[in-house]
Amino acid sequence: MARAKFERSKPHINIGTIGHVDHGKTTLTAAISAVLASIDNTVKLKKFDEIDAAPEEKARGITINTSHVEYQTPLRHYAHVDCPGHADYVKNMITGAAQMDGAILVVSAADGPMPQTREHILLAKQVGVPSIVVFLNKADMIDDEELLELVELEVRELLSKYDFPGEEVPFVAGSALLALEACLKNPTIGKGKDKWVDKIFELMDMVDKYFPTPERDIDKTFLMAVEDVFSITGRGTVATGRIERGAIKVGETVEIVGLKSTASTTVTGLEMFQKTLDEGLAGDNVGVLLRGVQKQDIERGMVLAKPGSITPHDKFEAEVYVLNKEEGGRHTPFFPGYRPQFYVRTTDVTGNISQFTTDDGGSAEMVLPGDRIKMTVELIHPVAIEQGMRFAIREGGRTVGAGIVSKILD
């Protein structure tokens, strides 16, 4: 059977559900797919147990259970990620296995914000999730309107505390379970027949309006991490790699950044699959011929970038998830002064971890396998790093942690 072609008629957005365990994230994910399927036969209804039985995936050497559900509103196409366990959320957000352009925070109206509600908001901030909308679930269990308002106020304060615009974040109160049940009874229910189903439509209207369309990788400034270098007699030096973002044309100037002092050069040729190209775009694996560059001047781990767009750094703060021993991580804790390898884009660089900071701003003496922690790192060579960049921590060739740069310090 021929594969269905992916139609690009609408803007595509990646979103996900976050929030405390048992507040209804997976039920809401199922309800959204069911409600949208009721007005659009191209949307496939996903049942709760299909989403809950999340397949294992590997991202940066870490196994994560995530479910991907696809659906569309009249305005946009969405890929929605839902993780069954709390640890899977932490790992997913730190490795960026499934990027989120926006998150739906699910809070049970019956319980109010709980510890993981707080932790997921903090994580969303630190890994750079740009916007949040809130779904107050299980609203059918609350008879008192004032109680709902109190929970909303509490969540708004929590969002403001972690630098989200708590005052303006959209809130919808509803019941994911009752909406899902109504759709299972009447799969073409549509709008206006059930108040709980209408609440899900209202939520998706908010998501459509409030989450901005992300800038496409191709519209960003050019960057390519160098994977390999070789020289072609009589023509010069070629750097190969995958273009991470932006576009590059023959004749343009690029900077070679990281490991050594930054140098500037001109692109004299581009090749892909042994064919010459006029322009390389985000996602392409290309060979870039560079004018006047010797093979020894450039190595794996450096990046080619638009001049002035990225600078080398060696000191940063990062949010890190440390693998436990079942995940193939360390069996023992580590302490300040630990010097593992930091795998940044295409290369390992040794770094010294000088201090650990807990969520409440205090300092930790040591870090155990399975912990999530903020740490300060100093690399022995400066490399091209920027806020929001992901990396792996390795020791003897195996991954012992995954992190994201939360702040540049030098």
Swiss-Prot record:
Alphabetical list of Pfam families matching this protein: GTP_EFTU, GTP_EFTU_D2, GTP_EFTU_D3
Subcellular location: Plastid, Chloroplast
Region feature G1, mapped onto this chain: 19-26
Domain of life: Eukaryota
First-tier enzyme category under EC: hydrolase
Stretch list, region G5: 175-177
Family: Belongs to the TRAFAC class translation factor GTPase superfamily. Classic translation factor GTPase family. EF-Tu/EF-1A subfamily.
Protein known as: Elongation factor Tu, chloroplastic
Source organism: Cyanidium caldarium (Red alga)
Organism lineage string: Eukaryota, Rhodophyta, Bangiophyceae, Cyanidiales, Cyanidiaceae
